[in-house]
Regions:
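Hydrophobic positions on the alpha1 helix immediately C-terminal to the Walker A/P-loop
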Residues: 99-100
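Nucleotide-activated chemistry modules centered on ATP-dependent adenylation/adenylyltransferase
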Residues: 12-14, 18-87, 103-395
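Short, glycine-rich nucleotide/cofactor-binding loops
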Residues: 87-96
Length: 395
């Protein structure tokens, strides 16, 4: 594992490996494993400054925020009064989407259709959590099962491409299946668990590239895939951002930003009321994501997504910096379980452990090495930031 405590950490910038003196933020724990991070004279990083300058003044998890989201909820009810469901919520079994379901039903009085995508990597824990939530609240569940042979082929292609963003096949399937379903069935409101409370520090793109960049997904699959993606759900970022929004009239709503949302309290409420089971860390409801984020990324690239996750919790007062430093110094999860996951992932992908190890040891690449729409995405991000619709740093 790359020891990032040393000065002279190697960081990747496109195809070039460059050296930069190691620095860690004095306020959160983001560091120069994000090669584009910057620090002010106090040693505070640009993520922290952006939080205090742009996010916090415009974030209202208070009476004002609740009043605003209740007005939106009334509009959702009016627009969906003649339908079986007035909105749709994609769920993974994780805390954000699970707590959102409770808020939507009980606080906002909505009638959501619960939408789940089974990409082949669900933990039993995540399946149980979804079932308990749906049964406990008396909601309808629609599950879309991805063709495993196509999913496996696409995931193998990303392994062979040697890029950090191995979760793109799963993430793309999740969002494409949801929005394609909404567009097909005339659903006008998609509620998401995206929030500032646990996600105000975004992972840099060199750690986790846009899963919605269909050009890149197709280019990697063209080079390394072996099976046609006949049924795999696909949706380009511009289809999602423009066509579905302005032609199909689909609106994305993020209610967690309008209420006080504290991760530990939310998990405890879910556990007490529904028998919901807690995870070791964010996104670990998927066995593949647990392995990819907790083992593969730190081992192969020196990227630890927990830095962004913990830094978000530090900024929102849910975790002390000292505790975050203690946590980040430890492996993401049990090392014996990591070894079991390594063997499980290899077997499920029809690889030997030696073949998976060879991929781990292969030359690292990035999204720059394959076709991408980053230029156009950047223009869109800049435009949204200019009109105040994009508050978080995305780079």
């Amino acid at each position: 594992l790359l020891d990032r405590r040393h000065v002279g950490l190697q960081v990747r910038q496109g195809n070039i490996m460059s050296k930069r003196p190691y620095m860690i933020c004095t306020s959160c724990i983001m560091d120069t494993s994000d090669s584009n991070i910057s620090f002010d004279q106090r040693g505070r990083c640009d993520y922290c400054n952006n939080y205090y300058d742009n996010i916090l003044p415009n974030w209202h998890p208070d009476e004002r925020g609740e009043r605003e989201i209740m007005e939106v909820a009334e509009q959702i009810k009016r627009d969906g009064k003649d339908r079986d469901h007035d909105c749709i919520i994609g769920v993974s079994g994780g805390v954000d989407s699970s707590y959102l379901v409770v808020l939507a039903k009980e606080k906002l009085g909505l009638r959501p259709l619960i939408f789940h995508v089974d990409a082949g990597w669900n933990s039993q824990q995540s399946v149980n959590n979804i079932e308990k939530l749906v049964d406990g609240l008396g909601l309808d569940l629609h599950t879309e099962v991805i063709n495993w042979l196509e999913m496996k082929d696409l995931q193998l292609a990303f392994f062979k491409a040697q890029v950090p963003h191995l979760d793109t096949p799963q993430d793309h399937a999740f969002f494409a299946a949801l929005y394609n379903f909404a567009a097909k069935h005339g659903v006008k409101y998609v509620l998401t668990g995206a929030n500032y409370s646990t996600e105000c520090v975004r992972e840099p793109l060199e750690w986790h590239y846009h899963a919605s960049d269909l050009l890149q997904l197709k280019d990697i699959h063209r080079q390394f895939g072996t099976r046609e993606l006949k049924t795999f759900p696909l949706a380009d970022i511009f289809t999602y951002k423009l066509y579905y929004r302005f032609v199909k009239g689909i609106r994305v709503v993020k209610p967690l930003n309008n209420f006080p949302y504290l991760k530990e309290e939310a998990m405890q409420e879910l556990a007490d009321r529904f028998g919901w089971q807690k995870y070791a860390h964010k996104h670990y409801e998927s066995r593949f994501t647990r392995f990819y984020e907790g083992y593969w990324l730190p081992k192969k690239f020196g990227f630890d997504k927990r830095r962004a996750h913990f830094s978000s919790l530090i900024l929102t007062g849910q975790l002390s910096r000292d505790e975050a430093l203690r946590k980040i110094a430890q492996p993401a999860y049990d090392e014996e379980m990591m070894a079991q996951d390594f063997e499980y992932i290899a077997t499920k992908l029809d690889l030997t452990t030696a073949e998976l190890q060879a991929l781990l040891d292969g030359p690292n690449k990035s999204y720059h090495d394959y076709k991408n729409r980053m230029g156009m995405i950047n223009l869109g991000t800049l435009a949204l930031r200019a009109v105040g619709l994009q508050k978080m740093i995305i780079r």
